[in-house]
Amino acid sequence: MKIYQDIYPISKPSQIFAILPFYSGDVDDGFRFGGLGRWYGRLVALIILIGSLTLGEDVLFASKEYRLVASAQGDTEEINRTIETLLCIISYTMVVLSSVQNASRHFRTLHDIAKIDEYLLANGFRETYSCRNLTILVTSAAGGVLAVAFYYIHYRSGIGAKRQIILLLIYFLQLLYSTLLALYLRTLMMNLAQRIGFLNQKLDTFNLQDCGHMENWRELSNLIEVLCKFRYITENINCVAGVSLLFYFGFSFYTVTNQSYLAFATLTAGSLSSKTEVADTIGLSCIWVLAETITMIVICSACDGLASEVNGTAQILARIYGKSKQFQNLIDKFLTKSIKQDLQFTAYGFFSIDNSTLFKIFSAVTTYLVILIQFKQLEDSKVEDISQA
C-alpha cells in the first residue's frame, strides 16, 4: 500500500474536489472504493455542472458587463475575453466530470500499483518522491494570478459587485483545478517513474550475470511480468486523465495566446489608455502567461519522465536478448509490443504530451498571435477611415 502513502499529501485535496475518488480503509486492511465515494464525486460534479451552466449563461449573454477596461478594448478584445472566460468554465467543469466518470478505473489503477508495491518492497524498493518545492511554485503562481485579478477587477474595472464575484469565482475554480490536476499527476507519475526505474536497474544487471542459470530465468520472467503490468497501468493513467488534459491544454493555449495579444493591444492603444491601465493590463497578462506556462511545464515534464522510463525497458531488454537463446522467447513477448509502438502520453489522442509540447504550443501561439494582430490593425484602420470621413 506504499503508493497510497506516497501520494497522501496531494490525495486529500484532490479527493475533496473530486479529482481523485474517495476510498475507505487503511494501510493494514486495504482500501476500498465504496458507494459513499461514488456519490460524493457525483454530488460535486452536479454542483459544478449546474454552477457552470448558470455562470456560462451570464457570461455569454452579458459579456459587456465583464469588460475589464472598457476604454481600451475594441470588439476583438471583448470577444477574446468572453471566449477565454467561457473556456475557463468549460475547462474546470470537464476536469471534474471526466474525473468522476473515470473514478472506478482510477481506483483500480491505484489498487494495481499497490499490489505490485508488495513485490517491490520485498526486493528492496524504498524510494519516495516529493514535489514540495514545485507545489510552492505552482500555488504561488496561481495565487499571484488571483491576487492581481482581484486588484484589477475590484479597483480598476467598472464591473458591478455581483459580476466581480462571478468572475473571481470562475478564475479561482480554474486555477484550483488546474493546480490540483498538475500536482496530482506529477506526484503519481514520478512515483511510477521511480518504480519502473528501480525495475530497469535490476533488469540491467542481467547484462553482467550468467544467463544460463534457471534462477536467473525465473527472476527475469518475474521482472518482465511486472514491467508489462506497469506499462498497462501507465496506459490506464493516460486514459483516465486524457480528457482532463485535453481541455486544460486547450484552455492554456488560448489563454497564453489571448493574454499575449491583450498585452500588445494595450501597449498600442496609445491615447485611449492611461499609463496606469497599460501597466496593470500587462501585469495581469504576464502573470496569466507565467502561471499557465509553469503548470504546463510541470505536466509535460512528468509525462515525458514516465514515458522515458517505460520506453527504456525495451532498450535494456534488447541488450539482454542476444545473451541466451532461452531468454529470447520470453523477451520477444515484451519487445513485440514495445518496439512497434513507444508509449506516449496524449491529450485524449489529439496530441502527444512531452517536453517538446511546450515548443509546439508556443510556435502555434506565435502564428496565431500574428493573425490576431493583423485583425486588430485592420479594425483600427477601419475606425480611422470612418473618423476621417
UniProtKB/Swiss-Prot annotation:
<dbReference type="GO" id="GO:0015276">
    <property type="term" value="F:ligand-gated monoatomic ion channel activity"/>
</dbReference>
<keyword id="KW-0472">Membrane</keyword>
<feature type="topological domain" description="Cytoplasmic">
    <location>
        <begin position="104"/>
        <end position="133"/>
    </location>
</feature>
<keyword id="KW-1003">Cell membrane</keyword>
<dbReference type="GO" id="GO:0016020">
    <property type="term" value="C:membrane"/>
</dbReference>
<feature type="glycosylation site" description="N-linked (GlcNAc...) asparagine">
    <location>
        <position position="80"/>
    </location>
</feature>
<dbReference type="GO" id="GO:0030425">
    <property type="term" value="C:dendrite"/>
</dbReference>
<feature type="topological domain" description="Cytoplasmic">
    <location>
        <begin position="303"/>
        <end position="352"/>
    </location>
</feature>
<feature type="topological domain" description="Cytoplasmic">
    <location>
        <begin position="186"/>
        <end position="236"/>
    </location>
</feature>
<dbReference type="GO" id="GO:0030424">
    <property type="term" value="C:axon"/>
</dbReference>
<feature type="topological domain" description="Cytoplasmic">
    <location>
        <begin position="1"/>
        <end position="42"/>
    </location>
</feature>
<dbReference type="GO" id="GO:0050912">
    <property type="term" value="P:detection of chemical stimulus involved in sensory perception of taste"/>
</dbReference>
<dbReference type="GO" id="GO:0007635">
    <property type="term" value="P:chemosensory behavior"/>
</dbReference>
<feature type="transmembrane region" description="Helical; Name=5">
    <location>
        <begin position="237"/>
        <end position="257"/>
    </location>
</feature>
<keyword id="KW-0675">Receptor</keyword>
<feature type="transmembrane region" description="Helical; Name=3">
    <location>
        <begin position="134"/>
        <end position="154"/>
    </location>
</feature>
<keyword id="KW-0085">Behavior</keyword>
<feature type="transmembrane region" description="Helical; Name=6">
    <location>
        <begin position="282"/>
        <end position="302"/>
    </location>
</feature>
<dbReference type="GO" id="GO:0019236">
    <property type="term" value="P:response to pheromone"/>
</dbReference>
<feature type="topological domain" description="Extracellular">
    <location>
        <begin position="155"/>
        <end position="164"/>
    </location>
</feature>
<feature type="topological domain" description="Extracellular">
    <location>
        <begin position="64"/>
        <end position="82"/>
    </location>
</feature>
<feature type="transmembrane region" description="Helical; Name=2">
    <location>
        <begin position="83"/>
        <end position="103"/>
    </location>
</feature>
<keyword id="KW-1133">Transmembrane helix</keyword>
<comment type="similarity">
    <text>Belongs to the insect chemoreceptor superfamily. Gustatory receptor (GR) family. Gr21a subfamily.</text>
</comment>
<comment type="function">
    <text>Dsx-dependent essential component of pheromone-driven courtship behavior. Recognizes a female pheromone involved in the second step (tapping step) of the courtship display which is essential for efficient execution of the entire courtship sequence and timely mating. Required for detection of the male sex pheromone CH503 which is transferred from males to females during mating and inhibits courtship behavior by other males.</text>
</comment>
<dbReference type="GO" id="GO:0007165">
    <property type="term" value="P:signal transduction"/>
</dbReference>
<dbReference type="InterPro" id="IPR013604">
    <property type="entry name" value="7TM_chemorcpt"/>
</dbReference>
<dbReference type="GO" id="GO:0050909">
    <property type="term" value="P:sensory perception of taste"/>
</dbReference>
<feature type="transmembrane region" description="Helical; Name=4">
    <location>
        <begin position="165"/>
        <end position="185"/>
    </location>
</feature>
<keyword id="KW-0807">Transducer</keyword>
<keyword id="KW-0325">Glycoprotein</keyword>
<feature type="transmembrane region" description="Helical; Name=1">
    <location>
        <begin position="43"/>
        <end position="63"/>
    </location>
</feature>
<feature type="topological domain" description="Extracellular">
    <location>
        <begin position="374"/>
        <end position="389"/>
    </location>
</feature>
<protein>
    <recommendedName>
        <fullName>Gustatory receptor 68a</fullName>
    </recommendedName>
</protein>
<dbReference type="Pfam" id="PF08395">
    <property type="entry name" value="7tm_7"/>
</dbReference>
<keyword id="KW-0812">Transmembrane</keyword>
<dbReference type="GO" id="GO:0008049">
    <property type="term" value="P:male courtship behavior"/>
</dbReference>
<feature type="topological domain" description="Extracellular">
    <location>
        <begin position="258"/>
        <end position="281"/>
    </location>
</feature>
<dbReference type="GO" id="GO:0008527">
    <property type="term" value="F:taste receptor activity"/>
</dbReference>
<dbReference type="GO" id="GO:0043025">
    <property type="term" value="C:neuronal cell body"/>
</dbReference>
<dbReference type="GO" id="GO:0034220">
    <property type="term" value="P:monoatomic ion transmembrane transport"/>
</dbReference>
<dbReference type="GO" id="GO:0016544">
    <property type="term" value="P:male courtship behavior, tapping to detect pheromone"/>
</dbReference>
